[in-house]
Structure formats: C-alpha cells, structure tokens
Amino acid sequence: MPLDNVRNIVLVLSGKGGVGKSSITTQLALTLSLQGHTVGVLDIDLTGPSIPRFFGIEESKVRQAPGGWIPVDVHAQQTLSAHRLQKTAEGQEIGALSCMSLGFILPNRSDAVIWRGPKKTAMVRQFLTDVLWPKVDYLLIDTPPGTSDEHISLLETLLKNTSTTPHASLPYLAGAVVVTTPQAISISDVKKELNFCKKTGIRVLGVVENMAGFVCPNCSECTNVFSKGGGEVMARDFNVPFLGSVPIDPAFVQLVEEGTRPLYPEGTIMAGTDVSAAPNGKEAGSTTHGSRLLICE
C-alpha cells in the first residue's frame, strides 16, 4: 500500500469553514521541511482544494504511473548555504516536499465539483490507496470543514491501514491539529470536531487559534479584531494542548497572492521572540519579504 512509505500522519481538522486550515497546513508543511523532514501534503477538500494555490503550483498536473498517481513536487531535498541562512554553520538541509490535490486533476481551476456522497467517499479512498508517496516523515492531511462523508471515509481507511501507537511496520496516525478562530460562533462548531475526535479515538495534538487579531503593516501592532482567547479556553475545557494564536497578517496574504510560498521569512516573530533568522531563498519556497507570525497579547 502506498502509505507504507509514510512514517507519521497528521490530520488538520476544523468544524468550521474559512478558519484557515489550509494556511495552517501549508505553514506546518514548510516548517517541517525547513527542519529537514521529508513531507507530503494530501488535500481532501474536494469542493474547495486550495493547497495548490498556497504552494504556488496551480498549473502543475499529477502523473499517472502503473501503480497509481505520482504526487506533485513542491521542492526537492536541498541544502541552503550558511550565507543565505545568516549562520556560521555549513548549511541547513531542507527536506523534500510533495503534495496531492483534486485541484491538480480538474481540467479547469474554476470547475465546480458537484458530487454526491458515494463519489466523494470513493475519491478519498483512492487518494489514500492510489497515491505513490515517496518515503516521507510526515503526511499532513488537509480536510474539509465539518464531519462529513469525507471524514468518515478518511478515518475508516486510515484506521484499517495505520497504527494509533508507534509501530515499526505501519504508518503512525499521530493525531489531529484542530484549527479555530476566536469568536464564539466558530468555537461552537469546532467543539463538535473535538467531540468527533474523542468518539473516533483520534488523539488531538493541539488547538491553533487562527485569525486572532490583525497585524498592522505599518507598525506591526496586533489588534484583536474579533474576540480574544476563545481557542485557548476551548482547549482547556477539553483538556487538550493549546498550540498558540496566529493573527491576520497582510504580508502572508501578499506572499500567497504573488504565488510565493509563505515559509517563515526573515522577521518571523512568535510571542515577541524571533524564531527564524533565515531569509529563505526561492529554492526553499520563499523570498526575503518581511512577514510576521505573532502572538497577540
């Protein structure tokens, strides 16, 4: 089975649409790659596949091989020079990154996917069984909102072919990252997703509160546009880890609109601390545009 080449599987879930699951998936994938891990991204949001846009590879097409589909390469394994990283070390290994999405298969990007449940279920199963992943350390699965046919088919197939504990011969279903926005209307829907994980036995790795404020492009001040702290309170109520808050950053949007992969550029800040001094070059999937990842206080 193609998943035999996968070491760890992480789901990115949310009970609410439009909270930024795909942007979180993209940043997780690029960050893991920057740390030297080989990463795959599977986009099973069939009616709104946006992962190709986030990676700037919308025009790419999957190739068919005798055993199944070959995922699209985002970038190959490479070494960034110490000069580019502004470090004294010899360099940094960037892990290979590849992805699979229905967006690569549709004849036109604007084509609507009007499928009933059985066809969606079959497509999800095909993505899990017919994609020829290379050896990857992490497979991130970007899911649609809610707890629909796609989720049920996804978990049925994964639970048959993976292990929920580290196992030498089976892919490890590590768990799920749950994404929300801070306002109450989003929290109420995302709570259903946490209950879904509990009922299906999927470990929740943590909650990310996205769009938790607005970063001013002039002064970098973060203003809480909606409410504040809803994701953290929800995580505490469900006794799961809270991974942090991510505000709206116009620089992030600009990178995506330009077709540039938003990979922790120089100036990335987490809770006021610089967490990446690297102006990652084009071969790493980014440019030296200043962009910030902030925690709103």
Curated annotation (Swiss-Prot):
GO biological process, one term: iron-sulfur cluster assembly
Note accompanying the cofactor annotation: Binds 4 [4Fe-4S] clusters per heterotetramer. Contains two stable clusters in the N-termini of NBP35 and two labile, bridging clusters between subunits of the NBP35-CFD1 heterotetramer.
Gene (name only): CFD1
Annotated positions binding ATP: G15, K16, G17, G18, V19, G20, K21, S22
Main location: cytoplasm
Subunit structure: Heterotetramer of 2 NBP35 and 2 CFD1 chains.
Binding annotation for [4Fe-4S] cluster: C216, C219
Keywords: 4Fe-4S, ATP-binding, Cytoplasm, Iron, Iron-sulfur, Metal-binding, Nucleotide-binding
Official protein name in the record: Cytosolic Fe-S cluster assembly factor CFD1
Keyword Metal-binding (UniProt): yes
Function comment: Component of the cytosolic iron-sulfur (Fe/S) protein assembly (CIA) machinery. Required for maturation of extramitochondrial Fe-S proteins. The NBP35-CFD1 heterotetramer forms a Fe-S scaffold complex, mediating the de novo assembly of an Fe-S cluster and its transfer to target apoproteins.
Parts of the chain that traverse the membrane: none
Gene3D superfamilies per UniProt: P-loop containing nucleotide triphosphate hydrolases
UniProt xrefs under InterPro entries: Mrp-like_CS, Mrp/NBP35_ATP-bd, NUBP2/Cfd1_eukaryotes, P-loop_NTPase, YlxH/NBP35
Record-linked SUPFAM superfamilies: P-loop containing nucleoside triphosphate hydrolases
Family: Belongs to the Mrp/NBP35 ATP-binding proteins family. NUBP2/CFD1 subfamily.
Domain of life: Eukaryota
UniProt GO molecular function: 4 iron, 4 sulfur cluster binding; ATP binding; ATP-dependent FeS chaperone activity; iron-sulfur cluster binding; metal ion binding
Cofactor(s) needed: [4Fe-4S] cluster
